Amino acid sequence: MGRYRESVCRLCRRENLKLFLKGDRCFSDKCAFDRRGYPPGEHGQLRPKFSGYGIQLREKQKVKRMYGLSEGQFRRVFAEADRRKGITGSTLLVLLESRLDNAVYRLGFVNSRTQGRQLIRHNHFLVNGKNVDIPSYVLSPGDVIEVREKSRNMQVIDESLAAVERRGVPQWLSLEKENKRGVVKNLPVREDITIPIQEQLIVELYSK
């Protein structure tokens, strides 16, 4: 994803949705979205009225920014979802949730997906006992994700796990907190994904 140089808190305000991009700060009273829940800029409190296309675009931007993907990466995931059997919008969200960078975040090993991508690329995690340094790696049921031995005393991981009860772990994953190990019990289904997204609008956008 191209480097975003502004405060990521502005993205939450722009999309009118808490995207949980700043880790623990998003759960504190310092959260910019909770304090100023309107778009950034001089005229931010006057929310614009969007056209049909604008509404579809904003919905795509929400999901793309939440999972930290570039436009090209997002299009590739959408193309894969469209190729598979089933409802394209739901499949899209399931594929995004099944990524390794999202799973280490959901398990509480990191406090944001961005941090998850950084640690994955630096070989701090194993999948089924093997090094995986690809954040977009798609997990399967039965996969075991664990912090590798040399990384088990990392402060950032310990601090994130200390707050996991507050965030919670989704039902499709199980966490062995003391062992710093997680298991994919099953693939997520749409009902497991509680983010307020209208994925059909994204399908309509890409169908034009």
UniProtKB/Swiss-Prot annotation:
| CDD domains in alphabetical order | S4
Q: Keywords in UniProt for this one? A: Ribonucleoprotein, Ribosomal protein, RNA-binding, rRNA-binding
Task: Please name the Pfam families in this protein's record.
Answer: Ribosomal_S4, S4
Q: Name one GO molecular function term.
A: structural constituent of ribosome
For this record, an example GO cellular component is: small ribosomal subunit
Point out the gene that encodes the protein.
rpsD
Q: Any idea what this protein is called?
A: Small ribosomal subunit protein uS4
Ranges of residues in domain S4 RNA-binding: 98-158
- Quaternary structure note: Part of the 30S ribosomal subunit. Contacts protein S5. The interaction surface between S4 and S5 is involved in control of translational fidelity.
Q: What does this protein do?
A: One of the primary rRNA binding proteins, it binds directly to 16S rRNA where it nucleates assembly of the body of the 30S subunit.
Sequence similarity:
Belongs to the universal ribosomal protein uS4 family.
Q: Which InterPro entries match?
A: Ribosomal_uS4 (IPR022801), Ribosomal_uS4_bac-type (IPR005709), Ribosomal_uS4_N (IPR001912), S4_RNA-bd (IPR002942), S4_RNA-bd_sf (IPR036986)
Gene3D superfamilies from the entry?
Ribosomal Protein S4 Delta 41, Chain A, domain 1, RNA-binding S4 domain
SUPFAM superfamilies on file: Alpha-L RNA-binding motif
Q: Which organism is it from?
A: Desulfosudis oleivorans (strain DSM 6200 / JCM 39069 / Hxd3) (Desulfococcus oleovorans)
Q: Upper lineage ranks?
A: Bacteria, Pseudomonadati, Thermodesulfobacteriota, Desulfobacteria, Desulfobacterales
